[in-house]
């Protein structure tokens, strides 16, 4: 066998090819002289490139030779060497001009942009969000990061390495990308392959001996084989025996489990700002210090959106500052993540809400986990409660003996939306952990949108029509009076029972109780659409309210007065929801709203209409009494007065509405068409 015979070439004529080709230790073929007709170095049939040492040949293996462009027919039409193969995403012919137009994957994209390569579909997948990218282009990567998670561009190399290791652990791979199956049968084969690769690398590291000492390469290889047969094989047998004995199987599984938990913890910290507690198998928010009920992404998303949505806009440096501040407080972390001894919640039970006990007096609170200087430096300040809530929290903490003690556990404040304050005039009551209506002073038991809408529909439906400036003025006066009452030191009820206020008296009560509650509620129901209607509320009711609040120690301020509005239109009769009922239908179509059936009732014939639609009204009039369209304004006024009198006789005592003013002619008879309907 001639020197260098272990290398195959496809130039015609046989092995080695014609011409004075100079060979080296491992069968390398050096470039021939200009006079020779040899061929350029080419790949073998398996698509593997020649192994070239850069120390002896310089940059010949990375750039094409100038003479290679002028080759004859022996070059088989090849114009370029495989200079891109070292960077290709797969071995062989990748990114060869004229043959394969697909792009190739760069290894530095993994740590720089956190993009992993999937050989099965020749594409990339994002290690941050798990999305698949369509093309292997840098512009695609940057556009994806800019649209999905721009904050990841500001992560430090250490944080990116954490994400990469977490991704490998998620796929069951090692830190270097090798399959990690500890305690499995395939581990021995993988180690054998690694040893063979290591041996090949050592063989390539042998220095070239020149053209006349080609057999030295074979001697070097035989020497390596002898070393391998003497030391590697016994070590492999010992490793196989120990693994068959099962000694390292449990240890490897535990080590893999520990690495998975650590990588999961680092991923939650960098991506979700959540600290993972492996002992309790739960998450703790690094922004507010609260424990989450489970590890589901839905719970994480709901917690962030309800408690501190502003944390979603944090930039990379801000997140890094928050992570550093959280990592600098190990005492607070251990106090927070350690379950309380009297906690009856099993740590692995992820279906129930976590019940965290309050920290001790000397332990830092959850709000102190992110120091103020770090948050100010990051430019992010969490939402602060209103003045009334701060005063309430301070008052409660002083009564318990712990100043500014945060409430932990099932805190319903996380469900409170700040927009409810101006949109529905609802304030959070920190004492009862419920809502307080700033219109009537009523207390709502639950922090639910359905409860708010039902309360407004039943008590004061007219408050929905208040303008924005009027609602802002009401909220401002409420906050001022609440702060004034707290400054006076008025006692607050400790029990969660709702105190009976003059404005929250039930409409179903008999006698004078309902009559006392109705004028105030109807006054709010009469509130006009525009700011400026005159206040028709008598001063006697205000005096009665002030007198009734002092002995009872009411925790909420009295009802504020809006600015004087213009004269209001005729109010609707019922306190039920009438968002689709138009008051003008009363005089224009002689249609009244029936609160018991939530529909319309005709004042002419007493018929009931199913839907609150103008088309239904017109169809009813055309089919039943089309002559009513020709009524004069005087006739319509007469029908309205007769209907008011009939309604007063039928259900004036049931709280349907305040008694209508007496008609001009008290002795007027009812019209035949006026029928009283409940």
From Swiss-Prot:
Q: Where is the composition biased (Acidic residues)?
A: 187-200, 512-524, 539-549
Where, by residue number, does the polypeptide cross the bilayer? none
The answer, when asked if Ubl conjugation is one of the entry's keywords, is yes
Protein's UniProt name = Zinc finger translocation-associated protein
| Gene Ontology cellular component annotations, sorted alphabetically | nucleus
User: What UniProt keywords apply to this chain's record, in alphabetical order?
Assistant: Isopeptide bond, Ubl conjugation
Q: Position of cross-link Glycyl lysine isopeptide (Lys-Gly) (interchain with G-Cter in SUMO2)?
A: 375
| Biased composition, class Basic and acidic residues, residue ranges | 79-88, 573-583
List the residue ranges of the region (Disordered): 1-100, 174-250, 333-413, 493-583
**Record field: compositional bias (Low complexity):** 66-78, 205-214, 493-509
Q: Which gene encodes it?
A: Zfta
Q: Where is the composition biased (Pro residues)?
A: 557-572
């Amino acid at each position: 066998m001639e020197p260098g015979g272990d290398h195959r070439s496809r130039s015609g004529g046989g092995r080695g090819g014609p011409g004075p080709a100079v060979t080296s230790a491992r069968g390398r073929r050096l470039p021939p002289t200009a006079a020779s007709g040899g061929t350029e170095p080419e790949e073998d049939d398996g698509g593997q490139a020649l192994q070239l040492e850069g120390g002896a040949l310089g940059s010949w293996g990375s750039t094409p030779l100038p003479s290679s462009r002028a080759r004859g027919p022996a070059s088989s039409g090849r114009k370029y060497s495989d200079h891109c193969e070292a960077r290709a995403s797969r071995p062989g012919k990748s990114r060869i001009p004229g043959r394969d137009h697909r792009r190739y994957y760069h290894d530095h994209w993994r740590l720089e942009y956190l993009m992993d390569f999937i050989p099965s579909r020749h594409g990339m997948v994002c290690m941050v969000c798990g999305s698949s990218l369509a093309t292997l282009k840098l512009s695609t990567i940057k556009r994806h990061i800019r649209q999905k998670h721009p904050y990841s561009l500001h992560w430090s190399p250490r944080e990116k390495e954490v994400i990469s290791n977490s991704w490998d652990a998620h796929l069951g791979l090692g830190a270097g990308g090798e399959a990690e199956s500890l305690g499995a049968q395939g581990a021995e084969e993988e180690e054998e392959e690694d040893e063979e690769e290591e041996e090949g690398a050592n063989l390539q590291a042998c220095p070239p001996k020149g053209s006349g000492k080609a057999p030295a390469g074979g001697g070097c290889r035989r020497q390596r084989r002898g070393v391998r047969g003497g030391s590697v094989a016994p070590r492999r047998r010992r490793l196989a025996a120990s693994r068959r004995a099962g000694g390292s199987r449990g240890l490897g599984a535990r080590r893999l489990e520990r690495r998975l938990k650590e990588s999961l913890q680092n991923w939650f910290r960098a991506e979700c700002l959540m600290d993972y507690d492996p002992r309790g198998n739960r998450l703790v928010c690094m922004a507010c210090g609260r424990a989450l009920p489970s590890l589901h992404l839905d719970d994480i998303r709901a917690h962030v959106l309800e408690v501190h949505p502003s944390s979603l806009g944090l930039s990379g440096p801000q997140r890094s500052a928050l992570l550093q501040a959280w990592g600098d407080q190990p005492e607070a972390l251990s106090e927070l993540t350690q379950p309380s001894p009297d906690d009856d919640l099993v740590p692995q039970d992820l279906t129930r809400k976590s019940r965290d006990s309050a920290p001790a007096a000397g332990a830092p609170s959850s709000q102190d986990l992110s120091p103020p200087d770090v948050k100010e430096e990051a430019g992010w300040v969490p939402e602060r409660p209103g003045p009334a809530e701060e005063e309430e929290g301070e008052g409660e903490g002083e009564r318990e003996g712990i100043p500014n003690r945060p409430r932990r556990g099932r805190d319903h404040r996380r469900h409170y939306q700040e927009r409810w304050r101006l949109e529905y005039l609802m304030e959070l009551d920190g004492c009862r952990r419920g809502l307080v209506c700033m219109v009537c002073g009523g207390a709502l038991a639950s922090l639910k949108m359905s409860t708010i809408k039902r309360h407004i529909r039943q008590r004061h439906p007219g408050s929905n029509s208040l303008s924005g400036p009027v609602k802002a003025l009401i909220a401002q006066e409420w906050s001022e009076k609440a702060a004034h009452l707290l400054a006076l030191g008025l006692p607050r009820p400790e029990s969660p029972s709702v105190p009976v206020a003059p404005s929250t008296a039930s409409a179903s009560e008999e006698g004078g109780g309902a009559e006392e509650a109705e004028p105030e509620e109807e006054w709010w129901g009469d509130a006009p659409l525009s700011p400026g209607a005159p206040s028709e509320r008598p001063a006697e009711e205000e005096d009665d309210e002030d007198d009734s609040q002092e002995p009872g120690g009411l925790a909420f301020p009295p009802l504020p007065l809006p600015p004087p509005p213009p004269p209001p239109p005729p109010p609707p009769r019922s306190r039920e929801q009438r968002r689709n009922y138009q008051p003008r239908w009363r005089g224009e179509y002689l249609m009244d709203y029936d609160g018991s059936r939530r529909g319309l009732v005709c004042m002419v014939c007493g018929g009931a209409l199913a839907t609150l639609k103008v088309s239904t009204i017109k169809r009813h009039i055309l089919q039943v009494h089309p002559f009513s369209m020709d009524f004069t304004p005087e006739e319509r006024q007469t029908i309205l007065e007769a209907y008011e009198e009939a309604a007063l006789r039928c259900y004036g005592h049931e709280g349907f509405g305040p008694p209508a003013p007496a008609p001009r002619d008290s002795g007027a008879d009812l019209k035949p068409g006026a029928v009283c309907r409940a």
